[in-house]
Amino acid sequence: MRRTKIVVPIMLTELTELEKVSVSDYHSADIVEWRADFLSADDIFEMAPKFFEKFKESKILFTLRTVREGGNIQVSEKKYLQILQEILKFDPDYIDVEYFSHGPSFAALKNYREKIVLSYHNFDEVPTDLTSRLIKMHEEGTAFVKVAVMPERECDVLDLLQITRDMTLEYGNHFISMAMGDLGRLSRISGYLTGSCWTFASLENSSAPGQISLKETVEILDLLENELA
């Protein structure tokens, strides 16, 4: 049995695409992530009831990844909060909130801490203040804390692994971390060492550089973690 949960994103660009999605393709995933930032706000609102009905047997993470953190949608703080509040009416298992980009929205959603994956994405580097950022995010008391950063050299990946391990030992097993790009692939399958509790895998199109396919991720984690659970 695997320790690390596998999250697989679904990135739909048109309302009609949902009909073509086969739920059975995601059976190997522990969590389905609806990356809604490829749709307009109005289309998100229209698709939401259909999406949650279609994946009612799955655990769902809702993510609205903004341009500022590597995503595809640019919205005001007010609109960002409005979208998240509307989605919460459908009772998702988890909802991503960009902590440093949308602090006011997080403040308005603190009553949903048990559902929140508090996130931070840096597509330029592994920041030198990453540990202090993780501590600050941890102190907010959300279900999970997620960071995705871009390594420039091998030691950046090793630093992230060590930081994740240190945070897990000190504060508990609710951290999700990954180094992006091909250089960072090791971080996506080393949760059994670092304590990172989720990894993100792709079914077809990856949602982040360096993402490994669902099939390969299942095979690798089964090999690495099967005797550890």
From Swiss-Prot:
EC number: 4.2.1.10
Catalytic activity, reaction form: 3-dehydroquinate = 3-dehydroshikimate + H2O
UniProt-listed InterPro entries: Aldolase_TIM (IPR013785), DHquinase_I (IPR001381), Type-I_3-dehydroquinase (IPR050146)
Binding-site positions, 3-dehydroquinate: 33-35, 65, 188, 207, 211
An individual GO BP term: amino acid biosynthetic process
Pfam families found in the cross-reference section: DHquinase_I
Gene Ontology terms for molecular function: 3-dehydroquinate dehydratase activity
Active site, UniProt feature: 121 (proton donor/acceptor), 146 (schiff-base intermediate with substrate)
Record flagged with keyword DNA repair: no
EC class (word): lyase
Source species, domain of life: Bacteria
Pathway(s): Metabolic intermediate biosynthesis; chorismate biosynthesis; chorismate from D-erythrose 4-phosphate and phosphoenolpyruvate: step 3/7
Keyword annotations from UniProtKB, A to Z: Amino-acid biosynthesis, Aromatic amino acid biosynthesis, Lyase, Schiff base
Family affiliation: Belongs to the type-I 3-dehydroquinase family.
Protein role: Involved in the third step of the chorismate pathway, which leads to the biosynthesis of aromatic amino acids. Catalyzes the cis-dehydration of 3-dehydroquinate (DHQ) and introduces the first double bond of the aromatic ring to yield 3-dehydroshikimate.
HAMAP family, per database record: AroD
Summary of subunit composition and partner proteins: Homodimer.
Protein name: 3-dehydroquinate dehydratase
Primary gene name: aroD
